Amino acid sequence: MDKVVLEKTINKYVDMVYRILFCHLGNKADSDDAFQDVFIKLYKCNKEFESDEHLKAYLIKMTANIANDYHRKNFWRNKIELQDIYQAVSDCDDDNYEVMDAILHLPNKYKNVIYMYYFEDYKANEIAGILNIPVNTVYSLLKRGKEKLKGVLDESL
């Protein structure tokens, strides 16, 4: 990937990649480090993308994988600082603020699917393809994730 295309890609997907990383990692420092890793890895890859949607799907999958790598490396640092959470979701309006905060507290397997389905508007079959899981598993994760999300939101009220 050449530098001009990379720069355009970064400008187009900066918010999406950062939100995914922050949802996974829960703090600004790790998210910043992982953000750099995502785009360095994208720059080094020699893959041709069929369309912007193909690039976006590849970027989401790669971002989630890099976030998981950071979890494995830093499993002992599993503490999320509230100040960082509030900073990341400060762009949300009041109605979405509590929902975003609750999503941050879900396990990663639910976060991924809920984020891609509701925030990136992917269909279940597209999510299944990106995450290499069956479509029915996507539906199950969505259902269970919504139930867990409802439980978290009910507790906060």
Predicted features and spans:
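C-terminal flanking helix
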Residues: 14, 18, 39, 107, ...
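Structural recognition of an alpha-helix C-terminal capping motif at a helix-to-coil junction
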Residues: 19, 33-40, 53-65
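C-terminal edge and immediately downstream basic/flexible tail or linker adjoining helix-turn-helix-like DNA-binding
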Residues: 1-7, 81-83, 93, 129-130, ...
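A short pre-motif secondary-structure segment
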Residues: 113-117
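Arg/Lys-rich amphipathic alpha helix in sigma70-family domain 2
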Residues: 50, 61-81
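Internal acidic/polar
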Residues: 69, 77-104, 123
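DNA-recognition helix of helix-turn-helix
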Residues: 64, 68, 131-155
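A short, charge-rich alpha-helical start-of-domain segment used by transcription regulators
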Residues: 1-19, 23, 32, 43, ...
